[in-house]
Amino acid sequence: MPREVPLERIRNIGIIAHIDAGKTTTTERILFYTGRTYKLGEVHEGTAVMDWMEQERERGITITAAATTAEWTVEGTPYRINIIDTPGHVDFTAEVERSLRVLDGGVVVFDAVAGVEPQSETVWRQADKYHVPRICFVNKMDRIGANFMRTVDMIRERLGAKPVPVQFPIGAEDRFRGIVDLITNKAVIYVDDQGKREELEAIPADVADEVERLRNEMIEAIAETDDELTLLYLEGEELSVEELRRALRKATIQGKLVPVLCGAALRNKGVQRLLDAVVYYLPSPVDIPPVRGTRPGQIAGDDGVEMITRPTSEDAPFTGLVFKIVSDPFVGKLAYFRVYSGKLETGSYVLNSTRNQRERIGRLLQMHANHREEIKEVYAGDIAAMVGPKQSYTGDTICDPNDPIVLESIRFPEPVIQLAIEPKTKADQDKLAVALGKLAEEDPTFRVFTDPETGQTIIAGMGELHLEVIVDRMRREYKVEANQGKPQVAYRESITVPADVDSKFVRQSGGKGQYGHVKLQVEPLERGKGFEFVNGIVGGVIPREYIPAVEAGVKEAMASGVIAGYPVVDIKVTLYDGSYHEVDSSEMAFKIAASMGLKEAVRKGRPILLEPVMKVEIVTPEDFLGAVLGDINSRRGHVEGMEARGNAQVIRAYVPLASMFGYTTDLRSATQGRATSSMEFAYYQPLPDALAKEIIEKRRG
């Protein structure tokens, strides 16, 4: 069966934004216009198609990235748009990270009243990291206080982007009734509520001057990115609509310009034009560089390791990346994956090259937020889901067994907040482990472990809301009732000076003994670098087959530090010497020797406790500014900057997480409910001695 839609006519896009900018509503409208849903879903009524988990419908926020396929016709040509709806709440950054990794382009939605909000900056930086070309949609133009040009200026100033308005609103707030398309230079007026009927009119006199100025600026910005157009422009030639679109498409894909559109998704205004813009300006899988990877067992960046590329074509060997695991009540485990090259049929085998496991492809599904369609094969550029994978997890590469490749995995931030959880009854005990296991499979930023000292089950995540949603899902989906402790800060340990150790594990008293001997150098890394292991063994003083055991022993010892039993981070461990015994050496012996060695090195390395620091943004009316600033200082925070936004003040500060529990409630009562705040993890920093002492005493009881 040949592919239905040629590659050039596929768009893989994500709709990304700050919470409440109207992202899910925009996606709903897209599904409505592309004929995938016949009744409009409303987030505030709790019927949105994309928000299919119960908690999402209740909270009116999006938690999981649902992937949906839609069709859209532009100028008589049908296109396929695969849409990934992503959450905008900071606690769910992992969802955004993994979506961006497999997208080709993004639609960033802004609220015309609030403009660029803190989470918009985070998402924008994430998109920069993966070089995702994007277009902007300034939504909620019908709300009181909506201001299109202010939002465009904020995109320029706060995000450091080069926004180019390709539309201009006619009217704002309740008088918002249409847009001027600056590319074609025509006014589009919406006649009915559904936004399905449009009429072209002459450009209204009250916006004519502004439109002319913006159109000239737009043409100049587009012409600057293309030498041929620059010449025509300088010679005073009129550039055609096709020339402008072609050059703007190229500049958008290269990340030089960002087209900006506007509308009001809830009123169905501007969404069809947004779909047209997705087709005109965002890349197809063919427009982006081919993916690169290494052969299994090799590490990118090591000496002598050559990178393999996979062109986006069906004739190349099959390569895909799993970007999301979901436990589905009807079909069990689903793995969403993006196909980068080749094609895949049901019934065939693939190699999971990340884990070196074969996986049989039973059924393939194409997803429409919560209704699914069975398909027989998928091709390069597609996004699909496979049913019941045995071995595959988020970030794994799946590929042709005869031509293996490992793509770069997806890196997720470490959890910063944890709480103890215990089942209410004996019956819940067994179900708890199953539920937590499945939830951890789905969400890489959610961790479950047992506290070695108290024996309690600890769950850790990115924020209070994140853990709240997890506990909620346990109750609803897995029917597990559990009591939860107070949220605790996830401290870490590290070292401040390098340390050298010589560690031996020897048991030789008759029969087969044990012998492992390693010399390790352990050095501090800069904050946020995690862990690095270097094998510096030369001349075979330790045989190669024991090296992985040494690394495993080091990692095991890092799980619980020497000061207060918190995980050890930001260290580089070099195995530079050691010895072995022909008969008595084993993997186990080397693992134990390495484990003991690391503990000793951390003791020698002047260990310290690290605490997570949050980046906090507070929007408060002027009258409460003094009180809010005083409060931040009392929480050991430091203010980084302030700016006026409308008649409110925006404070940006860094505050340790330990002093931020319940902050939203305190802030509300201090400001009569008029201030709002948002926070996200920023970095780990050393804990002041007096506080460290307190924590150590508490842990040691």
Curated annotation (Swiss-Prot):
UniProtKB keywords: Cytoplasm, Elongation factor, GTP-binding, Nucleotide-binding, Protein biosynthesis
SMART domains per record: EFG_C, EFG_IV
Keyword DNA damage found: no
InterPro entries in alphabetical order: EF-G-like_DII, EFG_II, EFG_III, EFG_III/V, EFG_IV, EFG_V, EFG_V-like, G_TR_CS
GO biological process: ribosome disassembly
One GO cellular component term noted in the UniProt record for this chain: cytoplasm
Compartment annotation: Cytoplasm
Binding sites annotated in the UniProt record for GTP: 17-24, 85-89, 139-142
A GO molecular function held by the record: GTPase activity
Residue span, tr-type G domain: 8-286
Family the UniProt entry places it in: Belongs to the TRAFAC class translation factor GTPase superfamily. Classic translation factor GTPase family. EF-G/EF-2 subfamily.
Family annotation (PANTHER family): RIBOSOME-RELEASING FACTOR 2, MITOCHONDRIAL, TRANSLATION ELONGATION FACTOR G-RELATED
Protein name (database record): Elongation factor G
Name of the gene encoding the protein in the UniProt record: fusA
